[in-house]
Amino acid sequence: MWSARRINRGSSNFQELVVLSRGLGARRLTLVDRGLHGNPGKLLFYDLSREEPALLLVIWLRGVVFPEKPRSIKKPVAPLFVASAGGYLDFAEELAVALNYSYIGEVGSSGMSLTGRRLLLVEPVNKRNLAYVLKFLEDSRDLGLKILVKRFATRLRSSSPDGS
């Protein structure tokens, strides 16, 4: 994500965006669709490593919570890992694949030292209209940004808080 480049789609169609992304050396493409009042409503993750782009994951957002005290979040020195709270989560593994990062399972169960590492932690919530919270941690410290996930869908399955 820190190597990501933001491109204003403008009037470009999807194929033009794919060609542009590949020209920049991208292996993944993430599209942000608008929700209510222009806020992010949906994230679509595509794999560009094949001849035809493949949709890997769709995430419907409930919202984004920014830190109380705005500050810049610097690019991590070591690669980011995706981890889950409360056991193995299919969604966390699918998110790791979509972002092209490693999924290490439940926090603390991998035996790997996380000192100096940044994590994208997936916490299950399972409330009506809210399935997961994505948190960014560094050295077990919350960096403040939270992404609230309403539901998700992959090529293989979909999930929402009510089980549908």
Identify the meaning behind each predicted range.
Residues 1-164:
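Phospho-regulatory, Ser/Thr- and acidic-rich intrinsically disordered linkers and terminal tails
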